[in-house]
């Protein structure tokens, strides 16, 4: 049964094949015979979905409707059913529309319009066969219709005008330019084949260019292009299709060719010869102009001339340059001519171009010299230096004072007219940067006028340069010469040999010597200096390495000391100025190379090869032995003892207990201000002289001041940090105040009991002092007297507070008189001039018209009463503190504030007499009065302000404290002077600068009569008032 199944399948396949073969799509194409003018139909069957042949071709630009139908399609299915034929594609349902149509019943395809091949060279028509239901009975077929070309387009050039350039004298067939034209007709067809041709050439004449007919390349016809004849050519070129046939279409273009210049013309001078004249010793920037002629293009290097002096310029006197604007050569005189050497000069001038000549003519060029005659005019000449530069050198070893007046040599000028040394000439030094030279004005001998440093900045590369001027006395002409002085350099690091003394054995007399590590310029060379003569025959030195050498005796030595002079040179052949002495001690040695002589400690040798210690031999290294002498052992023991003793001494100093009280138990360092000690006064002028201090006021020195302010009042403390006290007391306190006095223990006397220590301040000295008791009886007597004096002064002052008339104001003056000036009367008293210092005594005698007797050197002693009653309820509280020097602490320096005072302030001081039997104590301060301060003094005792002498009574000579107080009497309208700034501004010494405040300060407070005992004046005191002191107030200060 299986074979039956396969049989049926095979039959079915055969049936399908038969049906496929019988269904075909037939196309009939009408072909035209153009030559015979006949047409015929050709049937084309589609086999396996492929067309056999194209449809009939159509000619562009013609009416092809007479050829319709151009094709016919037919399907073999039309015998069984009704078929509709349809077409689509370009020219049907795509632009251009409506070119082709089809008969849907018969399948004939017709063309209906004119076609353009340049627009559509080929039409693709898709054909379909449809049944009544619109279904394709056949697969769509493609029908191709080709458009035949006709010559309807002329050639077109890419440019209407072509420009090109070509160098002149170019070889033949050199490409100039390539023309390009295109044709829109069918490619590779006769209608698009273009032929090129040169129609015309301007300028006319022999044709210079050739054109390739097919490529359009324009080339040179020959090598005779000459820019100097024609610099531009204009060609008219035609391009024709159909290979240039007469029936072809054509077009034309212009071709402009520029001929480029090359250096093919030789320059020549306008004249055949030239001449000029010039005075000798003169220069000229334009002696003569030479014109060159060149036919090449102007402004280019082919035209620009280059002038050359071929001969005659042996002394380099002339130079020639080209003017680029005119192409002329300018002959210049750059070096002075000498009539005596060359009265006439014959030059030869040649010319060529800046650019190289063209290869076509380069071999033909020859430079032809043109003669130029120069005549030198003789003139009267001055001196001149020959040679213009002369070298001198300083001999080795000349330095320091030996340079002074050292003669370098002689440099003289000559007379150019005669050639002999110049006469009537003065020599002077011109440029001399260091002012080191001097010259003899007549002989020209040059010397050093001063010493100089050989490392000066004026010495460059070891040469010092200066100029010498020679001036002719007659004509005034000047000649300049240059001298170059070679100054030998100082070798700061000249090679030095280690200076130690060396020991050598007599049986092996050799020792190693080395250069120290600070020397530079290795390797070094060593040699023995034969001084004294014959020593070089006894010793030989030979280098072992870059820094060492071995010194060997040539003969047997005797025990003793030897000094051998050795000269060491570095790699630059520089050496020390003097030979170095190598000290040797020769002795007999044992087997260990130890010196048997007890005077030598041992032998110090060094291994030549391994840098070790050992016997010095040339072949091997030995063992070094170093001995230590008794002196060395003693120094070692002494050092150990000092190391042990130093901590013990330090421990004793640190553990010593401090004595609580008493001057005798304190450590008092010896003062440095005693005799024999130099003091630095830090002042200008001569040093102070040693004179009697009893009648000489010590000079004022700068001192340190500091203004301290608390929250309630302003205090001014004046510290006499620069003062010096001499006498029997050990402390002096300066107290200035009004109601309250604040002071400082300022100085200490050198003769007081107890110890004192000197301390240095900014300027001068400041001493600490020991505390001691104050003589209260003396204080009572002192202040009682001052109180009486102030009371008498107030009672005796007349009341002059009334209208006063002054003559110098004139009559009817609108300005009123000044009242309330009764206190000025005392200032007008001329008796104050009798108490002026000796330096003002002469002025006072002139004013008083009398002779003033000097004050006696001693004052009368005033007995001190110990039981004087107190006058009035005055209470004085003295607070003092004394500290040991170990407690001294210093504060940082503080800037002193300027005093400011408001209004007019009256200050009055009363001084009491002191015991004349005691030498006055001199205190040196440096007061500085505030601006706008008027100070007048009515002195009751010879105490001139606190700069002067303070006389201390004899019974107080051994006391530690002496109080010096100033007091102001209060009156209505007078502001409270407890303000310490006022005190500083108008009375008392004002110290400028800063002070180091230490523990030696003591404060003295003076109480008001209304205050109870023990109450101090402070911020809560009813007698204390606060004032701001202005700097522009007028302050009148009176002392009594």
Swiss-Prot record:
Bilayer topology: Single-pass type I membrane protein
GO MF terms held by the record: calcium ion binding
Tissue: In scalp follicles, present in the inner root sheath (IRS) and all layers of the matrix and precortex (at protein level). Expressed in the brain, muscle, kidney, pancreas, spleen, thymus and weakly expressed in the lung, liver, heart and placenta. Highly expressed in skin, testis and prostate; less in salivary gland.
Family annotation (InterPro entries): Cadherin-domain_protein, Cadherin-like_dom, Cadherin-like_sf, Cadherin_CS, Cadherin_Y-type_LIR, Catenin-bd_sf, Desmosomal_cadherin
GO BP field: BMP signaling pathway; cell-cell adhesion; hair follicle development; homophilic cell adhesion via plasma membrane adhesion molecules; keratinocyte differentiation
Desmoglein repeat repeats: 884-909, 910-940
Keyword Transmembrane: yes
Residues modified by glycosylation: 110, 545
SUPFAM superfamilies: Cadherin-like
Entry GO terms, CC: cornified envelope; desmosome; plasma membrane
All residue ranges annotated as the Cadherin domain in the record: 50-157, 158-269, 270-385, 386-497
Location relative to the cell: Cell membrane; Cell junction, Desmosome
Sequence ranges on the Extracellular membrane side: 50-631
Propeptide: 24-49
Keywords from the named record: Calcium, Cell adhesion, Cell junction, Cell membrane, Cleavage on pair of basic residues, Disease variant, Glycoprotein, Hypotrichosis, Membrane, Metal-binding, Repeat, Signal, Transmembrane, Transmembrane helix
Transmembrane segments: 632-652
Disulfide bridge map: none
Stated role: A component of desmosome cell-cell junctions which are required for positive regulation of cellular adhesion. Coordinates the transition from proliferation to differentiation in hair follicle keratinocytes. Plays a role in moderating lymphocyte migration to inflamed skin and maintaining homeostasis of the epidermal inflammatory response.
Disease affiliated with this protein: Hypotrichosis 6: A condition characterized by the presence of less than the normal amount of hair and abnormal hair follicles and shafts, which are thin and atrophic. The disorder affects the trunk and extremities as well as the scalp, and the eyebrows and eyelashes may also be involved, whereas beard, pubic, and axillary hairs are largely spared. In addition, patients can develop hyperkeratotic follicular papules, erythema, and pruritus in affected areas. In some patients with congenital hypotrichosis, monilethrix-like hairs showing elliptical nodes have been observed.
Subunit structure as annotated in this protein's UniProt entry: Interacts with JUP.
Domain notes: Three calcium ions are usually bound at the interface of each cadherin domain and rigidify the connections, imparting a strong curvature to the full-length ectodomain.
Protein name per its UniProtKB record: Desmoglein-4
Organism in which the protein naturally occurs: Homo sapiens
Gene coding for it: DSG4
């Amino acid at each position: 049964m299986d074979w039956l199944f396969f049989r049926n399948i095979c039959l079915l396949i055969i049936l399908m094949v038969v049906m496929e073969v019988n269904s075909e799509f037939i196309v009939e194409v009408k072909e035209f015979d153009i030559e015979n003018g006949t047409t015929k139909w050709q049937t084309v069957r589609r086999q396996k979905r492929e067309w056999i042949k194209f449809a009939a071709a159509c000619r562009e630009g013609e009416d092809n409707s007479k050829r319709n139908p151009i094709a016919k399609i037919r399907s073999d299915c039309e015998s069984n059913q009704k078929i509709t034929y349809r077409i689509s594609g370009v020219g049907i349902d795509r632009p251009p529309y409506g070119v082709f149509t089809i008969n849907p019943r018969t399948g004939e395809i017709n063309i209906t319009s004119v076609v353009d091949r340049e627009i559509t060279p080929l039409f693709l028509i898709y054909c379909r066969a449809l049944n009544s239901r619109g279904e394709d009975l056949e697969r769509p077929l493609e029908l191709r219709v080709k458009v035949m070309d006709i010559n309807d387009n002329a050639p077109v050039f890419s440019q209407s005008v072509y420009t090109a350039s070509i160098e002149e004298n170019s070889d033949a067939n050199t490409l100039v330019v390539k023309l390009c034209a295109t044709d829109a007709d069918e490619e590779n067809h006769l209608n698009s084949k273009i032929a090129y041709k040169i129609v015309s050439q301007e300028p006319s004449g022999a044709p210079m260019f050739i054109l390739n007919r097919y490529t359009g390349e324009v080339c040179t016809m020959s090598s005779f292009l000459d820019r100097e004849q024609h610099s531009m050519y204009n060609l008219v070129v035609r391009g024709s299709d159909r290979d240039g046939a007469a029936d072809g279409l054509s077009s034309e273009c212009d071709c402009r060719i520029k001929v480029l210049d090359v250096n093919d013309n030789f320059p020549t001078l306008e004249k055949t010869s030239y001449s000029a004249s010039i005075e000798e010793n003169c220069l000229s920037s334009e002696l003569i102009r030479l014109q060159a002629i060149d036919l090449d293009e102007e402004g280019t290097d082919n035209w620009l001339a280059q002038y050359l002096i071929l001969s005659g310029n042996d002394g380099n006197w002339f130079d020639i340059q080209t003017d680029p604007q005119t192409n002329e050569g300018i002959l210049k005189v750059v070096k002075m001519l000498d009539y005596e050497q060359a009265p006439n000069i014959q030059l030869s001038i040649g010319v060529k171009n800046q650019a190289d000549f063209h290869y076509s003519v380069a071999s033909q060029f020859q430079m032809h010299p043109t003669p130029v005659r120069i005549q030198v005019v003789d003139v009267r000449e001055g001196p001149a230096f020959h040679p213009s530069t002369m070298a001198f050198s300083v001999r080795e070893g000349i330095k320091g004072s030996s340079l002074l007046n050292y003669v370098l040599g002689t440099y003289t000028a000559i007379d150019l007219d005669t050639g002999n040394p110049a006469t009537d000439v003065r020599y002077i030094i011109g440029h001399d940067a260091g002012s080191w030279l001097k010259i003899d004005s007549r002989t020209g001998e040059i010397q050093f006028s001063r010493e100089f440093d050989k490392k000066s900045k004026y010495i460059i590369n070891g040469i010092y340069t200066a100029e010498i001027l020679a001036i002719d006395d007659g004509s005034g002409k000047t000649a300049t010469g240059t001298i170059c002085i070679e100054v030998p350099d100082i070798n700061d690091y000249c090679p030095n040999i280690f200076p130690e003394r060396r020991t050598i054995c007599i049986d092996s007399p050799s020792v190693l010597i080395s250069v120290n590590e600070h020397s530079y310029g290795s390797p070094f060379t060593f040699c023995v200096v034969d001084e004294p003569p014959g020593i070089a025959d006894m010793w030989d030195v030979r280098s072992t390495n870059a820094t060492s050498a071995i010194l060997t005796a040539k003969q047997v030595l005797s025990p003793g000391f030897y000094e051998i002079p050795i000269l060491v040179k570095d790699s630059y052949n520089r050496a020390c100025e003097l030979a170095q002495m190598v000290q040797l001690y020769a002795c007999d040695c044992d087997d260990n190379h130890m010196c048997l002589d007890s005077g030598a400690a041992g032998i110090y040798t060094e291994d030549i090869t391994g840098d070790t210690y050992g016997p010095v031999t040339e072949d091997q290294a030995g063992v070094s032995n170093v001995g230590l002498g008794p002196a060395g052992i003693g120094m070692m023991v002494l050092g150990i003892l000092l190391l042990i003793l130093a901590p013990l001494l330090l421990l004793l100093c640190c553990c010593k207990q401090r004595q609580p009280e008493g001057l005798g138990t304190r450590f008092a360092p010896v003062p440095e201000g005693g005799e024999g000690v130099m003091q630095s006064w830090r002042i200008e002028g001569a040093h102070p002289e040693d004179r009697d201090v009893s009648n000489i006021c010590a000079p004022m020195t700068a001192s340190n001041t500091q203004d301290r302010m608390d929250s309630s009042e302003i205090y001014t403390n004046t510290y006499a940090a620069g003062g010096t006290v001499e006498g029997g007391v050990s402390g002096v306190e300066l107290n200035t105040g009004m109601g309250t006095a604040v002071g400082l223990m300022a100085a200490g006397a050198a003769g007081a009991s107890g110890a004192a220590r000197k301390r240095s301040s900014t300027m001068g000295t400041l001493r600490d002092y020991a505390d001691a008791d104050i003589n209260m009886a003396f204080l009572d007597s002192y202040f009682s007297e001052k109180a009486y004096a102030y009371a008498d002064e107030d009672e005796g002052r007349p009341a002059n507070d009334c209208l006063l008339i002054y003559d110098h104001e004139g009559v009817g003056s609108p300005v009123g008189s000044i009242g309330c000036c009764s206190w000025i009367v005392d200032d007008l008293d001329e008796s104050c001039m009798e108490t002026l210092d000796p330096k003002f005594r002469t002025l006072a005698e002139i004013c008083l018209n009398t002779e003033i007797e000097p004050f006696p050197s001693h004052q009368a002693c005033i007995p001190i009463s110990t039981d004087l009653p107190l006058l009035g309820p005055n209470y004085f509280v003295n607070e003092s503190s004394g500290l040991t020097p170990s407690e001294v602490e210093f504060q940082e320096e503080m800037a002193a504030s300027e005093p400011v005072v408001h209004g007019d302030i009256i200050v009055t001081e009363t001084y009491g007499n002191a015991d004349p039997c005691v030498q006055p104590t001199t205190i040196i301060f440096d007061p500085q009065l505030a601006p706008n301060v008027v100070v007048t003094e009515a002195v009751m005792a010879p105490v001139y302000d606190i700069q002067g002498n303070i006389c201390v009574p004899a019974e107080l000579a051994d006391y530690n404290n002496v109080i010096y107080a100033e007091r102001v009497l209060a009156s209505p309208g007078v502001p409270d002077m407890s303000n310490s700034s006022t005190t500083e501004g108008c009375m008392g010494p004002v110290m400028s600068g800063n002070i180091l405040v230490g523990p030696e300060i003591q404060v003295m407070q003076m109480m008001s009569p209304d205050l109870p005992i023990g109450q101090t004046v402070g911020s809560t005191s009813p007698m204390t008032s606060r004032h701001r002191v202005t700097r522009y107030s007028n302050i009148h200060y009176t002392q009594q």
